[in-house]
Amino acid sequence: MRRPMVAGNWKMHGTRASVAELIEGLCKQSLPGSVDIAVMPASLFTCQVVDGLKATSIIVGAQDAAIQAEQGALTGEVASSQLADAGCKLVLVGHSERRQLIGEQDDVLNKKFAAIQAKGLTPVLCVGETLEERKAGQTLEVVGRQLDSVIAEFGVNALVNAVIAYEPVWAIGTGLTASPQEAQEVHAAIRAQLAKENAEVAQGVRLLYGGSVKAANAVELFSMPDIDGGLIGGASLNADEFGAICRAAGN
């Protein structure tokens, strides 16, 4: 049985003071032991968050990593080796904001995926379609292509030590969300695509939903058979709301 996961992506939010306040709020939460819970602060705050949460079961991740695993001459980047040294356990790769706004392509994302795994970290591979692609009926095609890029490069077994997050771009930060049935349809298609390569891998990989998940809709979303938890954006900046989402995943 797949263990649920809830991961909070704090994006480019926070000051030292607000992060300290959020850490304090998270430490007060009653969190389910049956759920893997993670937060991903801006890299500037990684050590502050690792230290602040060390008495809890919450693990710390990163929002991005460099294309090379080791530290070196790559201005402005953070290597997976440095993230591991700071206490990170998992790293986002291919988030839609980096695909859409930074222009990261599959070849770059594949290098990041490999670098993350090379240092023993878990990549959280993000896939998802834009509103235009959804309206054109291309959702499964787009998501399948993004997934195929990694499988073609590394083989499906590389996903054994990875997590996949489906995040419809049109539902990120908009207040819109896919219905539980719409989200389940895509998650089921992802698992079916993996099953064509290896049924055991397909059954073991955790698939998270990301797209305006809140405490109010988390229970219904997480009740779907192929949704194993959530990648949480704005709601993860509120400790009480994030705690409620985590408890929903534990039910």
Curated annotation (Swiss-Prot):
<dbReference type="InterPro" id="IPR013785">
    <property type="entry name" value="Aldolase_TIM"/>
</dbReference>
<keyword id="KW-0312">Gluconeogenesis</keyword>
<feature type="active site" description="Proton acceptor">
    <location>
        <position position="167"/>
    </location>
</feature>
<comment type="pathway">
    <text>Carbohydrate biosynthesis; gluconeogenesis.</text>
</comment>
<feature type="active site" description="Electrophile">
    <location>
        <position position="95"/>
    </location>
</feature>
<dbReference type="GO" id="GO:0005829">
    <property type="term" value="C:cytosol"/>
</dbReference>
<keyword id="KW-0324">Glycolysis</keyword>
<feature type="binding site">
    <location>
        <begin position="9"/>
        <end position="11"/>
    </location>
    <ligand>
        <name>substrate</name>
    </ligand>
</feature>
<dbReference type="InterPro" id="IPR000652">
    <property type="entry name" value="Triosephosphate_isomerase"/>
</dbReference>
<feature type="binding site">
    <location>
        <position position="173"/>
    </location>
    <ligand>
        <name>substrate</name>
    </ligand>
</feature>
<dbReference type="InterPro" id="IPR022896">
    <property type="entry name" value="TrioseP_Isoase_bac/euk"/>
</dbReference>
<dbReference type="InterPro" id="IPR020861">
    <property type="entry name" value="Triosephosphate_isomerase_AS"/>
</dbReference>
<feature type="binding site">
    <location>
        <begin position="233"/>
        <end position="234"/>
    </location>
    <ligand>
        <name>substrate</name>
    </ligand>
</feature>
<dbReference type="GO" id="GO:0004807">
    <property type="term" value="F:triose-phosphate isomerase activity"/>
</dbReference>
<dbReference type="GO" id="GO:0046166">
    <property type="term" value="P:glyceraldehyde-3-phosphate biosynthetic process"/>
</dbReference>
<comment type="function">
    <text>Involved in the gluconeogenesis. Catalyzes stereospecifically the conversion of dihydroxyacetone phosphate (DHAP) to D-glyceraldehyde-3-phosphate (G3P).</text>
</comment>
<dbReference type="Pfam" id="PF00121">
    <property type="entry name" value="TIM"/>
</dbReference>
<dbReference type="GO" id="GO:0019563">
    <property type="term" value="P:glycerol catabolic process"/>
</dbReference>
<protein>
    <recommendedName>
        <fullName>Triosephosphate isomerase</fullName>
        <ecNumber>5.3.1.1</ecNumber>
    </recommendedName>
</protein>
<comment type="subunit">
    <text>Homodimer.</text>
</comment>
<feature type="binding site">
    <location>
        <position position="212"/>
    </location>
    <ligand>
        <name>substrate</name>
    </ligand>
</feature>
<comment type="similarity">
    <text>Belongs to the triosephosphate isomerase family.</text>
</comment>
<dbReference type="GO" id="GO:0006094">
    <property type="term" value="P:gluconeogenesis"/>
</dbReference>
<keyword id="KW-0413">Isomerase</keyword>
<comment type="pathway">
    <text>Carbohydrate degradation; glycolysis; D-glyceraldehyde 3-phosphate from glycerone phosphate: step 1/1.</text>
</comment>
<dbReference type="GO" id="GO:0006096">
    <property type="term" value="P:glycolytic process"/>
</dbReference>
<keyword id="KW-0963">Cytoplasm</keyword>
<dbReference type="InterPro" id="IPR035990">
    <property type="entry name" value="TIM_sf"/>
</dbReference>
